[in-house]
Amino acid sequence: MGYSWPGNDRELATTLKRAVLISADGILRPQDIYFDLRRIEADGKINLLRSPSILKAVKSPLFPVIFQSAAAPFFFILLILLFLGPANPSSNVGALFSWAIGWPTMIFGAFIWARFWCSLCPMGAIGHLAKKLLSFNIPFPAFLKQKSDWIIAMSAMFIIWLEIATDLRSSPFNTGLLLLSIMLFAVFFSIVFERQSWCRYLCPLGGMMGVLAKVSPFELRADRNVCASQCSTNECFVGSSSCEGCPFGQMAPSLRSNRFCKLCGNCVKNCPHGAMNLNLRIPGREIWEMRQFGAITSFLVISMYGGLLSELLETGFLYDRFYHLFFDLPEIVVFTLFFTVAILSANALTLVAAMISSQISGETTKENFARYGLALLPLVMTGFMAYHLYYLINMGVYFPIVLWQTFHFSIFERLVITVPPSWTLFAQQTLVLIGSLGTIVISYRLSKGKHPVRISRRLIEVMPHILVALVLTGFLFYGIQSFFY
């Protein structure tokens, strides 16, 4: 009632139609209704779809099917190698690929191509194929949608804990069980619920990649000018005769985060008005352009840091002292306590900074924690990149050796390379420094958005969080040095 409706009855009808399409349980809520779509943030971005060759490739019916068709059979081969191959992970092709190539590809890929990995993911592709054979198409429960952030945060922390506490890297069989379990969940939820509900609301790996993808220099967004003035049929959501709608149930003009986009290109194929843009942007720009921040998402980001740090410190004197306090308990219990303490400590440190910063910003501590906690994302991402870079370099060297020994192709022998440890350490430290700088810049930009005039006040507001970022950077430096070298 407080909106002027410059588009008259057509804009009103379109707005209500969109609201009905995305509403849950047939109830319209304020968050289902959005207007004034014409405001877009296109400055400083390059639309790659202006290239005819790129546009043709994305609109092709082979995209991304051709990649999924290759990934799905490979996934089953990988499972066979994990279950039936050698128990020694250094001799098992499946285990080497999973940990030396698979995980690094996911982490680095979240930056390089955002959440496109979820379009390639064989588990999601197999679930989608199962859906075509049998589908009940039940609407995903609204209460699970509301708790999705918590479910993803807890399940992602469980995956990180499981990997460390059970030394999953040393057991190809257990690695296979984990991948098989995720695939079965994906198939079950694909058959029972509408669209790709598992990938959107529940998948722990997809949830982690979605959060990390916020830092990516790529984004798929709609030109909301076109949506508001020309579209009344919403093919991006409902689909067309040749292509289904958004698998994540997103309305293109309301999409503002890489977290909810797997870059499958369905909206590009379906939109008859050419409103979709594949933008090249400044990495991390999405964070300082956000209008709403969720404390749960920030908790997940900081907890990912805590989980990573707990593993890096596991071989150091801090863990030794902690272990001696509980030496009479089973080792897995002691590590679980250490894992929990690391997560809670990282969150507590950020919370204290938020309590101080909120006194300057004039917002609540929760709002401040949500905003600046997300600013730590570049540091967390590069921390994971630095961690997995070591395995990519030092475990990856065994991959061609094992291929050569297994398949007796001499070409694999020529692919063996070695990298001096000092080079690896330098690359890891450089990544962490870049992430720390990115966090500081984004933190400042977030304060700038809150106080656009008084520079001194912005600096005072952001300083506690900059200090936290520097402390967390120092722990990463120490952890990498002590764990790997």
PLM features: residue spans?
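Aromatic- and glycine-enriched pocket-lining scaffold segments that form the walls
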Residues: R259-L263
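Nucleotide-binding/hydrolysis machinery
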Residues: M1-L37
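Short glycine-rich loop/turn motifs that provide flexible caps or phosphate-binding loops at active sites
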Residues: P6, I126, C264
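Short Cys/His-rich metal-coordination motifs, predominantly Zn2+-binding knuckles/fingers
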Residues: I22, G206, C264
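Non-ligating segments of multi-cofactor redox enzymes
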Residues: F35-S257, K269, H273-Y485
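P-loop NTPase catalytic cores that bind/hydrolyze ATP
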Residues: T14, C264-K269
